[in-house]
Amino acid sequence: MEVSIFLRKIKEIIKEDPSKLDWIPTKKNRRTRQELGLSLQDIEDSIITLEANDIFRGPEIDRDIPDEILYIFKKNLESQIIYIKLKLRDNKIVVCLSFHIDEE
């Protein structure tokens, strides 16, 4: 799926029902959230404001779940570059696998 179509779809899903955003609380994600003082609403807002030119990589196949496609973005937030990895599950759940300070 083209990145602009992917973004339009995930934004519609999140705006319609924010509970459809599944933020995965990995150690890196939790650390970034704590260091930057981010709420889940801040993370949601950052995802909602992503643009096609924020794409870093993708679409690419998820190595853990080959039926799912990943999109990786980088976005400036709180003077940091944030690495954001998203996918759409079953066309109805937005999964945020990564939302952490970029390590590259």
Protein language model regions, located:
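N-terminal intrinsically disordered, low-complexity regulatory regions
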Residues: 1-2
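Compact soluble domain cores
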Residues: 5-67
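Intrinsically disordered, low-complexity regions enriched in small/polar residues
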Residues: 25, 58, 73-75, 85, ...
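Functionally constrained cores in energy, signaling, and assembly domains
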Residues: 29, 33, 75, 96
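Basic/aromatic recognition patch in beta-strand/loop cores that engages polyanionic ligands
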Residues: 63-89
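Enriched for short, Lys/Arg-rich terminal
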Residues: 81-83, 87-104
